[in-house]
A protein has these predicted regions:
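Acetyl-CoA-dependent GNAT
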Residues: 2-78, 82, 87, 100, ...
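Conserved GNAT acetyl-CoA-binding A-motif
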Residues: 100, 107-118
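Loop/helix-junction capping segments adjacent to catalytic residues or to phosphate/diphosphate-binding pockets
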Residues: 12, 93, 124
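Conserved active-site alpha-helix within GNAT-family acetyltransferase domains
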Residues: 97, 121-139, 144, 148
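Conserved acetyl-CoA-binding loop-helix of GNAT-fold acetyltransferases
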Residues: 86, 92-105, 128, 132
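A generic structural signal for beta-strand entry/edge sites
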Residues: 76-78, 114, 139
Length: 149
């Protein structure tokens, strides 16, 4: 098992795994065309890695990506975790915690003061994970579904 920075070659070599992970993430939270959304996110991942605006770390087992965390700098003080996923077969082994520590380490090295993320209020395992890693609830997102007549 290896935790390391992800580069463009890793994204290309692990395209199938990444798209499967994105499908798991997206299908839980949206009703949009999942395949198109996965392609869009995967393409952005490659662009943001190429222009160094993404911070991505991955967990690898024999060169196969088994999870990743993708963050970016909002401003010099605040970093946002955009996507975070560990393959179901590898959960509860400390991989997520190690990936999170890598993001924290990199943010501290750049003098960042805060890491933020969104988590759905019914994703209890994620909420528990973040609380265990010293994250605290800081806001509540409100939304209204509009009816189209």
């Amino acid at each position: 098992m290896e935790i390391r920075r992800v580069y463009i070659d890793d994204i290309i070599d692990n395209e199938k795994n990444i798209k499967n992970y994105l499908e798991d993430l997206i299908s839980e939270t949206t009703k949009v065309d999942v395949k198109e959304r996965i392609k869009e996110i995967y393409d952005r991942m490659k662009v943001f890695l190429s222009d160094n605006s993404a911070i991505i770390y991955g967990g690898f087992d024999n060169d196969a990506m088994i999870g990743f965390i993708w963050a970016y700098e909002i401003n010099s003080m605040v970093y946002h975790i955009n996507y975070f996923y560990i393959s179901k077969a590898y959960r509860k082994r400390g991989i997520g915690t190690e990936l999170l520590k890598q993001i924290e380490k990199e943010c501290k090295a750049k003098h960042g003061k805060e890491i933020e993320l969104w988590v759905k209020n019914d994703n209890y395992s994620a909420i528990e994970f973040y609380q265990k890693n010293n994250f605290a609830e800081s806001s509540i997102k409100m939304k209204k579904i509009l009816k189209i007549n």
